[in-house]
Amino acid sequence: IPEFKEKRIKNMLLITSGFAEIGAEGRRLEEALVQAARDADILILGPNTMGICNPHDTLFCCGSNVRPKPGTTTIVSQSGNLGVQLLDFAEHEGIGIRAFGGSGNEAMITIEDYMEAFEVDDLTQTVVLYLESVKNGRRFFQSAKRVGKKKPVIMLKGGRTQAGNRAAASHTGALASNIRIFEAAARQAGIIVVAQPMDLL
């Protein structure tokens, strides 16, 4: 990371896993990573992410060969595998994609940051979310309410079973909230809540 600072690099996409999602040792490593990035004035997307894509700019930095056409639907997924499945479905069905982000562990850039970006992005006309947890519930729901007044926000919440909760923790390094409470709050914020992945698109 200090070498990146010398090259004046401001952003880093970190696909690598082995950080907060694996436990205490990984959390310490992630905290050290974040501190090094802050010292170098660098923003990290990830770690433990499948990457990003922006078909409008032919930017495909993700662990998949899918190439959906440009469009107006933006996808952010805390599960990289599900995110890639959604991209594959979009490509197969001819659904245009504005952008995709696999948010990973959200060590620096969080789902709340994404939501605030969607609010001012005119190319995004529909927001699709797969969430396992949020770090700042108040900020998330406030931004979702603002975005929802301008464009639909569609969400699938992971962790519907005990096994799902464990899987969510392994993906994001955070515990999933009680799903009924979370979904009720989401509906109050104007989010369209669905129960199956393919209902997102």
Regions found by a protein language model. Name each.
Residues 1-201:
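Catalytic-core regions of core metabolic enzymes
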